[in-house]
Amino acid sequence: GPVALIGMGARPTVIADYSAGPAAFQAGIGRVFATPMSAATVIDAIDDVARGLARRESERAAIVVLSTGGREGSGGGYQRALDRLKASGASLHVVMVRSPARSVQDDDTRQRDTLLDRGVRNTGGSRRDVLASQAFAPAMADLARLLAHQFRVVYARPQTLIPPESVTITAASPAFRRRST
């Protein structure tokens, strides 16, 4: 499906707009650059992208956050972004560099970390914390495989007077992961 590339340094910026072809996305990757002395705006970016995805018809929408952590500069709470993420139907996937020595310092960073944690859990997404930016490429390759091999399962229960309390889904191979939204 269509893919877009959004930068989060200083403010959310569309680097490559939604396109089904890889050429525009590859060109956008060439325009990604560091923005020193500015805080990331992860909360705002997820909020904006989720709002845009809610207006689009998409079979399997996903938001992928690739971040080196650091200070959050959105200045807002996580709840609105979490609500919009739910309304969009998108899954949230996060790959982030985490330094073992880094601690959460301010409220905005705690808000971002809460959004990433709850967003992944609530949407059936995934999160991978890596210790160095050199691990981004293998982590993104794993995520690409995960996204490429997803299937939508629709379940309709038989008409009974008392509905079942739960639905159990199993896989023949233990290598399969099940996620639900």
Language-model segments: residues:
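Conserved alpha/beta-hydrolase fold motif
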Residues: 3-5
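C-terminal "exit" segments of structured domains
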Residues: 132-181
